[in-house]
Amino acid sequence: STNVLTALRTAPHIDGSQTERRAIKHLVRCMREGIRPVNILIKIPLLLPGEYAVTEIEPARSLYAKLQDIESQQGILDASILIGCAWTDSPYTSVSVIVVAEENSQKAREYAGSLARDIWMRRREFGPDVETVPVEEAIEKAMKAEERPVFISDSGDNVTAGGAGDIPIILEKLLDAGASDAVIAGLADPDAVRLCIQAGVGSDITLNIGGELDRVNGYPLAVTGTVEHLDPPSLAVL
């Protein structure tokens, strides 16, 4: 069981330290004053990819701003919005609202219900704040762009949200398009790293990259390249 629930309030997440301090403050207060907090959770039947709920743009900006208004009410300890992970195949994933009361569960339920209704009423306003296109089209636009650099993000294979981080599809499409001035931020493949270490810096090598951790969404890609840099035992640059 949990005494007090509190969550991050920024997306992308930049308020980790503030959230930790807030949780500790609540816990210490409850211990010192003998408060027995009540956590009220309301789940909303809504799946939102994280990039649809960036807190610097609407509607997330004004919805998250309501949290402080709720917390300012007498008898309320904390309030949180949890976007959830849309890609998690689980009955527990969805947007949720949590309000923590000092003791009065009815008051917490009222505030949680009001915030949940606000989110539901604005559900069609959620969306990405950047252009979304198929991989091939994204690469074509990036190669023609006059302003550089251009970032292409695979929001599905997200290692901070449960993705394997080893899907080489974008790399494959870049090679097919002849994008010689592109950089892939990283692919998880311990076996490929070991092969590069065995070959040594400056060596030409042909090997398979990616597609080992998750064969559902990706597959190994055969590539040939030069080992440019090594940081054993965990990093190789081709």
For the regions a language model picked out, list residue spans one by one.
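Short acidic (Asp/Glu) and glycine-rich catalytic loops that position anionic groups and cofactors
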Residues: 3-7, 42-46, 91-96, 148-154
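C-terminal active-site/capping subdomain that shapes the small-molecule cofactor and substrate pocket
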Residues: 129-154, 159-161
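Acidic, Ser/Thr-rich peripheral helices and adjacent loops at domain boundaries
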Residues: 188-238
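Active-site histidine-anchored catalytic micro-motif
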Residues: 1-36, 149, 154-171, 175, ...
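General structural feature for long, well-ordered alpha-helical segments within catalytic domains
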Residues: 15, 19-27, 59, 63, ...
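A generic structural motif
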Residues: 126-133, 181-191, 208-212
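Short glycine/threonine-rich loop-to-helix capping motif typified by GTGT followed
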Residues: 52-59, 141-143, 159-168, 196-201
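Accessory alpha-helical/coil subdomains and C-terminal extensions
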Residues: 35-42, 48-137, 144
